[in-house]
Structure formats: structure tokens, C-alpha cells
Amino acid sequence: MLQYQIDRIEHQVADDRAQTGVFLIGPLERGQATTLGNSLRRVLMGGLEGSAITAVRIAGVNHEYATIPGVREDVLDILLNCKQLSVNSRTSELEIGRLVVTGPAQVKAKDLQFSSQVQVVDGDRQIATVHEGHSLELEVHVERGIGYRPVDRHNEDVSAIDLLQIDAVFMPVRRVNFTIDETAVAEGGSTRERLRIEIVTDGSTTPDDALAESANQLIELFQPLATVTMVEEPGLEPEPSAESQIPLEELNLSVRAYNCLKRAQVNSVSDLMGFSYEDLLEIKNFGSKSADEVIEALERIGISIPQSRTSA
């Protein structure tokens, strides 16, 4: 298998603290670049854990279609602005941030007061505009999760009618693009591939960490396949042949041989197949003539038994 290398050829931080990283991975065998690119993209876009604002409480507001006196934005605008905030919580517990601002003021993300467990990535992002002589009191809830979690109206906490739920986007990666280039022809004339992958995050994690975490998830997914233990189905007993089911009476044995076998609990050909020639001779009153008779009767239906126990 080819030993490939990973090079980060570009890293940018935008004004909103979003980060872009571009990586080159290669050389790879034909087809491997597509496999890597698709797998990494799926995990990067939907499998990484992140943080998001999941609910907002605004003093004096109990539904999302309200307006706030002295505030330029309506409640829906404020909820949308909060939804777009990039935050990074280092705990799995619910975290709450609060602010109280008196106008005139531009209310920004950095005005939110959190515990030391939560970092606001883009502190300059606008939340609302408060006019002179008015104030805004606001509370946001931050949780960790994976993927996208829409508001479940059926399970909303009706006891907190002023807590406005938000569709939560936990995905720390905003965009992933990849392209595949052919590299120099290797020995033997086989063409190699190189994967170029661009990862854009919201700033709560770096592209390097996002790539590493997605790779670790894929390793954990595939690792059990390397040590698969096959569980064999219990073997089915072979069905007995039609000949073995023939009753003893149909062998047309002499009365003496028939009676001796019956006394020995031999009732069918299948019972006889457990005997050797020596075993037949040990049956009481069963001589060599009767044994030969049984051997001949069995041979007529295509069955033979061993001469001795050791050759069975």
C-alpha cells in the first residue's frame, strides 16, 4: 500500500473568525482519493460535535412574532442573529449567557456574559440595536450536539412560555469541497491521484482539528471490520437417504436372521449401518451364514458395511 503524506497548503481566518484550511493528500492509488474525499466530507459535514444556541429568553416577550419597544429589530430578527452566533462550549451541560444593555447601543455577541466554559467566537456579530431611553434584557441557552436539531413543537416546555426555542445547527464545519488531481506516472505506468480538500469551519474549531476528528471517527467505524469473528451457523444434520429408511422386513431375510436382528433392536437399514461384519457375528445365535445373508441383502440396495470395527 502506498505511503501518502498530508500537507496543509493554506490557512485563512476571516473577519467573522471563520477558518479555512486547504490540504493536499497523496499520492494515492486510483479510486482512493474519491473514497477518502467522500468519507471525510460526510463526517466533516454531519458527524462532528459542536455547540449552538438552542433557546432565547427576552424580557417582556412570550412569542416570536412580537416587537420590542425601543429595539430596531423584531424578535424574529434577534432569534436569527442568535442562531448565527458561533460559540464553543467545553462542557456537555447546558450553559446560559445573559446581557442587559441600555440604549443607545449596538448589542453584540461579546456583550453576552457566560461562564468560563463557553467562548464566543465572533464577539463583534450584531444581535440588536437599542435606542436611547430603552433597554434590552436577554438570555441565551447553549448546548452541545451533532448535526441539525429542529425545534420540536410537541415537546416544548410549556411551563416556560417566554423561552423561545431555536432550530439548532451544531455543525462546526460550514463547507467542504474536494478535487482530485492526477500526479506523476509511477513505475509500471500506473497513474497516482492526489486529493485536494478545502475545509471551512465557523471558528469554534480549526480545519486541522476537524480533519483529525473526522479521520478518527472513520478509524473507529472501520476498526472492528479488521478483526471480524465469523459466527458459524450450526451445521444441519444431513437428511437420511431413502435406502436407510427401508424397514428390516423389506430385506427378505430368512426367519432366523430376521428374528435375531429384531431381538437385537435392529428395525431398519439405518440401524444395520451402525454394525460391522464382526458386530453381526456377536449377535446371539447369529452365525456367519446369517451375516453373509445380511451383507448380500444390503449390497442389493447399494449399501456396504465394514468388515471390522477398526475399518469403520
Swiss-Prot record:
Keywords: DNA-directed RNA polymerase, Nucleotidyltransferase, Transcription, Transferase. Residues 1-229 are annotated as: Alpha N-terminal domain (alpha-NTD). GO terms for molecular function: DNA binding; DNA-directed RNA polymerase activity; protein dimerization activity. It holds the Pfam family RNA_pol_L. Residues 245-312 are annotated as: Alpha C-terminal domain (alpha-CTD). Its EC number is 2.7.7.6. The keyword Transcription applies. CDD domains: RNAP_alpha_NTD. One of its GO terms (biological process) is DNA-templated transcription. It catalyses: RNA(n) + a ribonucleoside 5'-triphosphate = RNA(n+1) + diphosphate. GO terms for cellular component: cytoplasm; DNA-directed RNA polymerase complex. InterPro entries: DNA-dir_RNA_pol_insert, DNA-dir_RNA_pol_RpoA/D/Rpb3, DNA-dir_RpoA, RBP11-like, RNAP_asu_C, RNApol_insert_sf. The keyword DNA damage does not apply. It comes from the Bacteria. DNA-dependent RNA polymerase catalyzes the transcription of DNA into RNA using the four ribonucleoside triphosphates as substrates. The N-terminal domain is essential for RNAP assembly and basal transcription, whereas the C-terminal domain is involved in interaction with transcriptional regulators and with upstream promoter elements. In cyanobacteria the RNAP catalytic core is composed of 2 alpha, 1 beta, 1 beta', 1 gamma and 1 omega subunit. When a sigma factor is associated with the core the holoenzyme is formed, which can initiate transcription. Belongs to the RNA polymerase alpha chain family. This is DNA-directed RNA polymerase subunit alpha. It comes from Prochlorococcus marinus (strain MIT 9313). The gene is rpoA.
